[in-house]
Amino acid sequence: MDSSALGLTCLAAAIGMAIAAAGCGIGQGMGLKAACEGTARNPEAGGKIMVTLILGLAFVESLAIYALVVNLILLFANPFMG
């Protein structure tokens, strides 16, 4: 594998993971903010809100896991390299 191609692959993997992690962080923060506001407005619905929040956070976190899998494929089994 060419060293410049390896360097560009590592750079692409790092940028991709950074974007995915930033998106997940923003999404989780917005979800938590909405859950806190909902619980503050209606404390009796706290249990339902918590279940929905946990499910939503799991879906948001799956984006980072998918990005990690793609980055690992790029780094260790790069289909673009000969």
Swiss-Prot record:
Record's subcellular location: Cell inner membrane
Spans traversing the lipid bilayer: 6-26, 49-69
InterPro entries associated with the record: ATP_synth_csu_bac/chlpt, ATP_synth_F0_csu, ATP_synth_F0_csu_DDCD_BS, ATPase_proteolipid_c-like_dom, F/V-ATP_Csub_sf
Annotated site, Reversibly protonated during proton transport, chain positions: E61
Keywords annotated in UniProt: ATP synthesis, Cell inner membrane, Cell membrane, CF(0), Hydrogen ion transport, Ion transport, Lipid-binding, Membrane, Transmembrane, Transmembrane helix, Transport
GO molecular function: lipid binding; proton-transporting ATP synthase activity, rotational mechanism
Protein's membrane topology: Multi-pass membrane protein
Domain of life: Bacteria
Key word Transmembrane helix present: yes
GO cellular component: plasma membrane; proton-transporting ATP synthase complex; proton-transporting two-sector ATPase complex, proton-transporting domain
Keyword set includes Transmembrane: yes
Subunit structure: F-type ATPases have 2 components, F(1) - the catalytic core - and F(0) - the membrane proton channel. F(1) has five subunits: alpha(3), beta(3), gamma(1), delta(1), epsilon(1). F(0) has three main subunits: a(1), b(2) and c(10-14). The alpha and beta chains form an alternating ring which encloses part of the gamma chain. F(1) is attached to F(0) by a central stalk formed by the gamma and epsilon chains, while a peripheral stalk is formed by the delta and b chains.
Similarity remark: Belongs to the ATPase C chain family.
PANTHER family: ATP SYNTHASE LIPID-BINDING PROTEIN, MITOCHONDRIAL (PTHR10031), ATPASE PROTEIN 9 (PTHR10031:SF0)
HAMAP family, sorted: ATP_synth_c_bact
Function, in words: F(1)F(0) ATP synthase produces ATP from ADP in the presence of a proton or sodium gradient. F-type ATPases consist of two structural domains, F(1) containing the extramembraneous catalytic core and F(0) containing the membrane proton channel, linked together by a central stalk and a peripheral stalk. During catalysis, ATP synthesis in the catalytic domain of F(1) is coupled via a rotary mechanism of the central stalk subunits to proton translocation.
Full protein name: ATP synthase subunit c
Organism lineage: Bacteria, Pseudomonadati, Thermodesulfobacteriota, Desulfovibrionia, Desulfovibrionales
